[in-house]
Amino acid sequence: MLLVSAVAVGAVLSGSAQASNYVYDRELGFVARATLRQATEPPRRVPRNQVFRAYVRCYHSERGFERAFEQRYGAPADRVIAYYAGGSEVYLRNTTCRNVHLFIRGRHTIETSAAFSILLHEVLHRQGVRDERITTCLANDAVHAGARLLDFDEKRAVRARELAFHFTKRYSPPEYRMGIPHCRLLNRRTDWTDHRVIER
């Protein structure tokens, strides 16, 4: 009887550990959604209910994130920072979430600015923006809107955006990169709502 109980308790604890591999980070979901709304031009400002809610899943460990990705796609996740798999959830590595929180608190480095842009990138996919190059461009540019929304001054907001662009230029695969002059032109002529594909 004791052995059976121990096995049962072990199974329950194992199931709980599996279920608690991540948390839904409400702050990151709220900030991303507010940033995307702020990133649209005032005359065309998208109504709040047109910016779809995203549930940001932050994993407690790198291994938990990698295991979930590998189970879903059957491919290694060692080079994956974050992803969107349809629905209303976006999936972020532990370090990505931590760096976004540092960005929100005012630490703007290449890593934290990139992490904030990566969060916005995945939430843009949730909004229906599909093309990776355009999504990255829009996310990098929206870092400025997010920094201003978080009450950082113009100089800091511009710097954070430039750091996000620098990270993309330096570290992202070619299919995610758009030349900065082309990206700036795209952002002057359009905003993310022009690039969304809403599946009915």
Where are these regions (language model features)?
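Short acidic, glycine/tyrosine-flanked loop/strand segments centered on an H-E-D-like triad
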Residues: 92-119
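Alpha-helix initiation and capping sites
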Residues: 25, 29, 86, 109-113, ...
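Second-shell loop/turn segments in exported
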Residues: 23, 104-109, 122-129
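Metalloprotease/metallohydrolase-associated module, dominated by Zn2+-dependent proteases
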Residues: 40-44, 57-59, 63-68, 72-75, ...
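Active-site recognition of the HExxH zinc-binding catalytic motif
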Residues: 113, 117-130, 136, 140
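Solvent-exposed, charged interface segments at domain starts and junctions
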Residues: 2-10, 113, 120, 186
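Short N-terminal micro-motifs specific to bacterial/archaeal maturation
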Residues: 10, 126-127, 174
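A metal-dependent hydrolase signature that marks the N-terminal structural subdomain at the beginning
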Residues: 1-3, 7-90, 100-102, 199
